[in-house]
Amino acid sequence: MSQVFSNLFQMTQRLEAQGQKTLDSPFVWDDGSDHDDVTKIHVRGDSRGINCIRFDYIKSGQRKYKSFYGPSWAGFTQTFKINHKEDEQLESVEGFYKPDSRTIVGLQFKTNLRISELIGHGKKDDTKFSLAVDGKKIIGFHGCSGSYLESLGAYFTCIAPTRMEAKGAKGGTDWNDGADHEGVAKIYVRGGRDCIQYIKFDYVKDRKYIYGPAHGVRGRGFTESFEINHLDNEYMVSVEGYYDEGDSGIIQGIQFRTNIKTSELIGYNNGKKFSLAANGKKIIGFHGYADQNLNSLGAYFTTSPFIKLESRESTGDLWDDGTFEGVRKVCIHKQPVLYSVIQFEYVNRGEVENRDLGLRVFIAEEGEFVVNYPYEFIISVEGTFTNEKDPHVASLTFKTSKGRTSSTFGTPGTKKFVLQSKGCGVVGFHGVLSNDYISGLGAYFRLLPPLPDGEKVEAKGGDGGASWDDGGFDCIRKIYIGHGEMGIAFVKFLYDKDNKFVVGDDHGSKTLLGVDEFELEHPDEYLISVEGSYDVVDGSESEVILMLRFKTNMRTSQVFGLDTTSSFILEKECHKIVGFHGKIGKMLHQIGVHVLPIID
């Protein structure tokens, strides 16, 4: 394998063309480096190689169209679009060329967000090459094209990190730890009576700790820390918190999430909720405002790397689907002994894309495994190989981020393999075909993204009282209902998040009439709907909730409050309730829910 890789960080860097060295050829071409980004790549080829290529660029917001290099013969045509408006940038190119003719036969393009499928082919005797510079993006190409593409090189420039603006108030001193780090190593938080007093971050760069300053002022309260093990490929991926919606705007509570674990909420869940997260990226620095307390917090993000794993027992022709946002379905077809076809259903920018491989004769469908993307990812693939001279994949089993395991497809062999990367999910598959059978299987992994927020179902009831919102969790564990003379006076909910109890706030006031409870049988039972009624009562200018009744996948609760006819139902088909919101005064005026899709 020929590899060109550099860690130099000059503004523009030229990597020499890989393939046939023909500098004196009349077919040498050079697009130069006077571009901001690559926006589209056109590739034409046939079974003998890539015969024609063209690159479109962006400069100062305008597209620049270059010429096709090479003849336009019959064969396949493929394009790869790069969406610079979504901060997508071309980072590297891998390819294959014939060692005798030096003709380039296959190309694969990698951006900071995804990897293209292999365009063309890569056989076991072909030479592999790579054009990549750590921390840089491609802004131009050069090469040589005769009857086929004979060589390809690239120009690189530095990638700027993504800055997410600070959430909270902008009073006090503007502080900035910068983005010149590889990751966050440790976080120290000092909490006071009503807010976060100060915060401090330690970072890592070149395997060395960088100790950051404290932002804010130390006072009476509690100190907590959260450590990230970068040696175990652990990265900070998001921050959630709350800030005061009043004049102060200061941070009330904060919670950190890595690709492996989530911290406890440090502080209080009071005020307006905020989130610092970017899909497929990790946090490498923080900034914000601080005075006597932490007033606001923002972050710098950079792309997290794809992790490419593979297991093979024999040689053959390479296949590579590239990467997508997630996997939705895997379908298995087989002949009596060996796998003949595997079909993958991926999601890319909201669209479903299908890929399949293998021999399409005498096949029968064995089964399928459906993944509830974007709330669920495949996190590991376990398999075995056949006991033969030229082994092939004999069985496959898939596990997901929600703890589900598929049935075992196929008949297990004796030699096992596992594709898994801690804290990451599968976003694409690749492998090896030998005599039209799958002799090797690999997967692309990427950091598990923050789960999408649950859908908020509008509250029902009157307009009186003050708003409250517990937010969304994984499920409901227990419900407390306090009675008043004319309806519901108090509610409180016990939630579950990452298999840990989360106690919700008290909403309303308990009365002498007492508090009833409704407990769910976790983890098998979950809440699917809430029925209730509301009306104006004596002493209240707006409607109050008179009655509530809860329905799960297993049973229906007793009536809480007055035994009246139901006037509303809070539910969404194929969803479960994972949180509550509403309005409360002396009585409960409104109640609404947060829901998430039910995973079978």
Curated annotation (Swiss-Prot):
Recorded superkingdom: Eukaryota
Xref: InterPro entries: Jacalin-like_lectin_dom, Jacalin-like_lectin_dom_plant, Jacalin-like_lectin_dom_sf
Keywords: Lectin, Repeat
GO terms of molecular function: carbohydrate binding
Boundaries of every Jacalin-type lectin domain copy: 12-158, 161-303, 304-447, 454-597
Annotated PROSITE patterns: JACALIN_LECTIN
One Pfam family linked to the record: Jacalin
Annotated SMART domains: Jacalin
Recorded family membership: Belongs to the jacalin lectin family.
Name by which UniProt lists this protein: Jacalin-related lectin 18
Native organism: Arabidopsis thaliana
Name of the encoding gene: JAL18
